[in-house]
Design a protein with these regions (language model features):
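ATP-binding N-terminal substructure of ATP-dependent carboxylate-amine bond-forming enzymes
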Residues: 1-103
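Phosphate-binding site of ATP-dependent enzymes
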Residues: 170-264, 268, 292-299
Length: 349
């Protein structure tokens, strides 16, 4: 029987090659508490920092992803860790990989590699997966760079979080102002990604790892990564989907219709997303944002190694479906069934 402890992010990740990944306020303790409460109320044994956690206090339900936090959870009987945190090479959790523990989430070393949006896009491109044209700009290049792309462009952090720090620019002046602002702020480091803007429909696709799942009471074995139904995004702000920490996704996202889900374009982008999941050898769900060009062809423009897993488990969180949960509902999963199927994919080192 699993004794599950949920980890949250307690501190900023280290700067890597001059690039800083920003930290979400609370370090995903909100989704961690959602997960813990949903599992606990459905009979799964959850280890918490205190004996009687308060439903309104996120930190009562989750452990910090520090050496002390992990040891505290183990001392209370945890044998499985849900890695609901930002991972990277030499993360504290790696020191516990030889302790015969189980883990739910990605391998830190892989997240460290594929959190780099430019590197990941190049991996996908080299494997014939369609991604937008892009180029890197450093703070040293601010007045000297040569633009190899045509406007409009999207300016985005290399190791960003959701749509935070992402802006659309339509001309040279807007680009200069955006670069100057992002570099002077220093929140994302001294390198950013410029990407060709695609003006078609935006969708997001959750890719599940290979494994055995229970869907509508039937056990199904997937030999390769597979896709949950695509979700379309709308109500963009300045052509960019707003960060879901500011606007609940149920207000700007909807699973595609049955006819849309059967379309050639969607089936084609599914195959690209599944291939991406295979290339990355994922151990847990990832979410891939895709956008169509003027001809309806979809390109993969953002791969998220740690999709949000919020859910309406607590009374005050009833509008907190994640994009992945919207997809999961389409195949008949509740929030608990999504989480239970993620537990089924737990791994040991």
């Amino acid at each position: 029987m699993n004794n599950i402890a949920i980890l949250y992010q307690a501190k900023l990740p280290p700067i890597k090659n001059g690039i800083q990944k920003p930290m979400k306020p609370g370090g995903y303790s909100d989704s961690g508490a959602d997960i813990a409460y949903e599992l606990k109320k459905n009979g799964i044994h959850i280890i918490t920092p205190i004996e009687n956690p308060d439903i309104n206090i996120d930190l009562d339900w989750v452990f910090p992803d520090t050496k002390e936090g992990i040891e505290h959870a183990i001392s209370k009987g945890a044998d499985t860790f849900w890695l609901n945190t930002v991972l990277y090479k030499k993360h504290e959790i790696e020191h516990f990989f030889d302790k015969k523990l189980q883990f739910i989430g990605q391998l830190p070393e892989k997240v460290d590699i594929y959190d780099d949006k430019y590197f990941t896009n190049e991996v996908l491109r080299k494997n014939q997966i369609p991604v937008p044209k892009s180029q890197l700009i450093t703070s040293k290049d601010l007045t000297e760079y040569k633009l190899s792309l045509s406007f409009p462009l999207v300016v985005k952090p290399i190791r960003g979080r959701g749509s935070q720090g992402v802006t659309l620019v339509k001309n040279q002046k807007e680009l200069y102002n955006s670069l100057r602002n992002i570099f002077s702020d220093k929140e994302y480091g001294d390198i950013v990604l410029l990407e060709q803007y695609l003006n078609g429909q935006e969708i997001t696709i959750t890719v599940m790892p290979l494994g055995t799942y229970v869907i509508n009471q039937n056990e199904i074995k997937h030999e390769t990564p597979w896709c949950l139904p695509a979700v379309k995004r709308f109500n963009h702000k300045d052509s960019i989907a707003p960060y879901n920490g500011n606007i609940a996704v149920i207000n700007n996202s909807l699973v595609l219709s049955d006819d849309e889900l059967k379309s050639k374009e969607i089936l084609e982008v599914y195959s690209h997303c599944q291939k991406a999941g295979e290339l990355l050898q994922i151990n847990a769900p990832i979410r891939i944002d895709c956008r169509a060009d003027e001809n309806g062809k979809y390109y993969l423009f953002d791969l998220n190694m740690k999709p949000n897993m919020t859910g309406p488990s607590r009374p005050q969180r009833q509008n907190q479906d994640s994009l992945t949960l919207l997809s999961a509902r389409k195949i008949g999963w509740s929030y608990f069934e999504l989480l239970k199927n993620m537990i089924r994919q737990s791994w040991i080192v």
